[in-house]
Structure formats: C-alpha cells, structure tokens
Amino acid sequence: MVSRLEHPAGGYKKVFESCEELAEPIPAHVSGKIPAWLSGSLLRMGPGLFEIGDEPFNHLFDGQALIHKFDLKDGRVTYHRKFIRTDAYVRAMTEKRVVITELGTAAYPDPCKNIFSRFFTYFQGTEVTDNCSVNIYPIGEDFYACTETNFITKVNPDTLETIKKVDLCNYLSVNGLTAHPHIEADGTVYNIGNCFGKNMSLAYNIVKIPPLQEEKSDPLAMSKVLVQFPSSERFKPSYVHSFGMTENHFVFVETPVKINLLKFLTSWSIRGSNYMDCFESNDRMGTWFHLAAKNPGKYIDHKFRTSAFNIFHHINCFEDQGFIVVDLCTWKGHEFVYNYLYLANLRQNWEEVKKAALRAPQPEVRRYVLPLDIHREEQGKNLVSLPYTTATAVMCSDGTVWLEPEVLFSGPRQAFEFPQINYSKFNGKDYTFAYGLGLNHFVPDRICKLNVKSKETWIWQEPDAYPSEPLFVQSPDAEDEDDGVLLSIVVKPGVSQRPAFLLILKATDLTEIARAEVDVLIPLTLHGIYKP
C-alpha cells in the first residue's frame, strides 16, 4: 500500500485553493460505463474558502464549509456545490474579515469599534464556530452538515440550500459532538461528546438520537444520554474525533492529546488565541481504552492501557468469543498530528513536505483486542485466546490490562486513513475488507484496500492525481462483502481542461469502471455520504 510516486511538481497544492460556488449543476463528461443500478447522490463536505479578503485562514480545518454533490442517474452525472450559509461564513463575507475564531485562526476585533466596545466583547466570551466543513449525516428525514462543536446545520440535500442552524446544547448535555456518528439500519444515531460530569469533572457522554417516529416529531427532541465515560483528567478532556460500536458495546479510546479547559475558557479574552492554542499533550499518560454496554447503557470498569498514540478514525470493532476486536488508524506518540496540518506546511514544495513528515507522528493500522472476562489472579498472563491475531492483553499487578497491538499495515510516512467499510452490512461485525485514502507524507495520492485478515493490499494511483476518502456502495444483488463500487472525488490539475472527476472503482480489485470529469477545480473534501 506504499505510494509508488513522488510529487515534485506540487500539484497537490491545488486542493488547498479557494473556489467559487456554482449557480446550478454542471454536466460531467463520462468515460467508461456507470453501473445501471448506481443512481443517487454523492454528498461531500470540505473547506472551500481559505481566505477572507486579505486575511488567510491558517489551518486545514479553518476553511469555510462547502457542500458538494455528484448526482448519478441513467449513466449521466452532474456536479453542484454551494457554501453553507453558516454564521461564520455570512458574517465573514459581510464584514470582509474573519469574524469567528476557527481551529487555527483567531478572529480579531472590528477595527471600527472603539476600545470600550472591544473590551465588552472580549468579556462576553468568544463565539463558538458553526463552520460545518467536516461531514454530513441524516437525522430522521433531515440532513445535517457538521463540525465538532455544539452547532450542526440543516441542509437540503437536493438543492444544497442552507435551512437552519441547530444548537445541540438545547437537546443534550454535551459541549459538542463528533462528526463521526454511528447510524443503525433503523436510523438510530449514536455519537459521543465531552460534558461536565460528577463534581464538575469532565466526562464523555454517549448520546442516542432515535429514528423518525410515525408522528413525524423531531428526533432531536427525543435524544438522550445513554452512558457516560469518566475522564482521566478532571479539567483536561481528551480530543475525540470518533468512537467504536459493536452490536452490544461502545468503545472509547482516550488519548494523551488534551484540551486545557482553563486555556479554552480564557485564551481569547486574554490573548486573542485560537483553538489550537488550547491543545496540549500529556507525555506520561499513554492511551486508555474504555468500554460500555450498549443496552442498557452501563460503563464497564476495566482499566485497559497501552502506549501513547493519536487516533482520529476507527475502522471497525466487533465481538468474538468474549473479546472485542478494535481496528484503528493510529499515529504513534503523544504529539498532536494537527500540529502538522497548517496550510503553510501543506502548501510547501515537495521536499519540504517530506521533511515535515519526518518529524511528525508516524501512522500505523493496528488491531487491539480487549477481553471482557477479566480476573485479577491472572497476573502476567496474556488473556487473548483468539487464534487469528497476535494482539495481546496482559493483566498487571495494579489491576490494569496492558494491550499490545497486531500491526495490520505500517509504512514509513505512508498512512492508511479516512477508512471505510461495507458499513450497512458489517459495521460492528466480523469483517474482512477496509478501504482508505493513502497519504504520502500527508499528501493524498492513492486509494487503498486492505484485507484485515490476510493483510493483502490493493491500490489505485495515477501521476499527479489526488483522491479523497473512498465511499463504498454495495451492489443491490451482492453476495460477497466487497461486491460493490468505491466513489472518490479526484483532483488532477496537470494540463487537462477537466481538472477534477468522480472516480468509480470496482471494490473487489480497485480497477476503474468509469470517471465523470468536470471543467472546474474541486478543493479538498473530508467526509461524506452516498444518498440513494
């Protein structure tokens, strides 16, 4: 799965350029044959505006939210995109400056206000961004674009129009939710976010949003906290980007990347800082795994520990013979990977990009195994008895269980990230195949497939082509797990008059089925969904 290419021409810089929205959908030029059954919409979220006037955004996740849609019907394809009318976007465009602080970019006071107005504004507290550039998912019959704060934005998936901003704090006891919910076949949504728990200590709540009911009432109004995980540090919650779910359990990985709550509450009013200034790493903590029963929701007080790593994306988790198998995309060590995702770093020339990646945490796909039946008298013993894995779990004298992983893939500065599976059939179940975006020194330059049982790999790659997260769509008459297609938006700037396309690959071997080229450049997209 290691990249075969170098990128001295720097074409990857094009995915970090601002674009304009489209007034209406544009036709795509199709080559190859799109399967007749593939009829629906690929909806993607990402940053589309990287500066406001003369003020640049600093971090990859600061760019203003742009929703993309490829419509597929009867072998024809159209492409459309619009900026989400968030408060962050509308006010920035109106005032022609950054108005709301983003992850790595601070908003500064309006120079037209006098000193007393600015002083009053500071001590009112900073506005939390609603820049929903990370993902989109359904709640009931509605679709919401999201980031990781308490705000989500309802959008029309057909017209891409913005409908309304929703504050999750009006429904749930959370400070925000991740952009990676788990969604069951009936439409039930599960997610995780930090909150204030007992004795004003920080904690993490798993929340449940029910499916749409017959009376068509708002599912958010019936949402509830299902179970709570304690925090390892009272006032420093870990950064949480995703979580795991099996048929009967939730898996939460607590990493040493922390949010310093005191800095978070005071930094803007005192120093005009941004969110990134509030992160710090606990180099003594390592990484903790937490488990909870799903129904009824109950915390399981087993103390699983392992060496330090960053985790953004879970691949899958499943139960087998009294064990929970957890497959993750990890980054070794306690340093925060987001420190390397500033736009100034990502836009550097190829040799400089490679040098920066040498200093960054190194990626690795890992499998951990957590035993459910634990006895203190088994000290020093490996509790894992599954025959197909080398992962271990050893009982220690202090009652903790030390985990060592099985490495499923490792390549120097070669990441398997933005993982996807046949979610509708195999999420939370024993599975074989994972699909992902290959990062070459942080540059996305290939699509990958991994057999998690045999470790066999496949890749799709072209020179000067920069794909996005591949989404799996199952064939309607599928019998095998990987019977379907992968959809990915690819940017290929080069000399072509059509610098971007929707790529359709056969999921079994990553051979190309078709592509739908458009005559506009498409900036980086992060996550999305396929809507039949």
Curated annotation (Swiss-Prot):
Cofactor: how and how many bound: Binds 1 Fe(2+) ion per subunit.
Record localization: Cytoplasm; Cell membrane
Cofactor(s) named in the record: Fe(2+)
Catalytic activity: an all-trans-retinyl ester + H2O = 13-cis-retinol + a fatty acid + H(+); lutein = (3R,3'S)-zeaxanthin
Similarity comment: Belongs to the carotenoid oxygenase family.
Described function: Specifically generates 13-cis retinol, a stereoisomeric form of retinoic acid. Capable of catalyzing the isomerization of lutein to meso-zeaxanthin an eye-specific carotenoid.
Residues given in the record as Fe cation binding sites: 180, 241, 313, 527
Span of the signal peptide: none
Topological category with respect to the lipid bilayer: Lipid-anchor
Enzyme Commission number: 3.1.1.90, 5.3.3.22
Tissue expression pattern: Predominantly expressed in brain. Expressed at a low level in the eye.
MF terms (GO), sorted A to Z: all-trans-retinyl-ester hydrolase, 11-cis retinol forming activity; beta-carotene 15,15'-dioxygenase activity; metal ion binding; retinol isomerase activity
BP terms from Gene Ontology: retinal metabolic process; retinoid metabolic process; zeaxanthin biosynthetic process
Positions of S-palmitoyl cysteine lipidation: 112, 329
Main localization (coarse): cytoplasm
GO cellular component: endoplasmic reticulum membrane; plasma membrane
Domain of life of the organism encoding this protein: Eukaryota
InterPro entries for the chain: Carotenoid_Oase (IPR004294)
Gene: rpe65b
Protein name: All-trans-retinyl ester 13-cis isomerohydrolase
Keywords carried by this UniProt record: Cell membrane, Cytoplasm, Hydrolase, Iron, Isomerase, Lipoprotein, Membrane, Metal-binding, Palmitate
PTMs per UniProt: Palmitoylated.
